[in-house]
């Protein structure tokens, strides 16, 4: 994020009723913010509202990870940049990934202790490995902001702190 993020009037509605807000939020570049609260307090709703407002400036790790079970971890991570390439490039990457893409994804997965799972189908991953694959996808997006909704809930202590 190059400039401070200023959001005013964030409100969430469910069934026509306001369930959150209106809220104002100011975030400076480099800030790390954690939302803490009881179940049902609106944390996930607030994250979705922020993501809807900032769009492509943010990478999102949702609670529902959105992994494609039939595809290997590489392709699930690579999906973060699909819109940066044309359809032919993406199709070629599905068949035989380019070296630069393989190296970039492998580097991120290495940071997440997942290098050995590069070509494993997402369906064969444990819950914690699935979360790390989704985190890898968000990091590969290389957006100015990272929004994560319970991103380490299935990770053990040492991995969660990493």
Q: What does each of the following model-derived ranges do?
A:
Residues 90-117:
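Conserved ABC ATPase "signature" region
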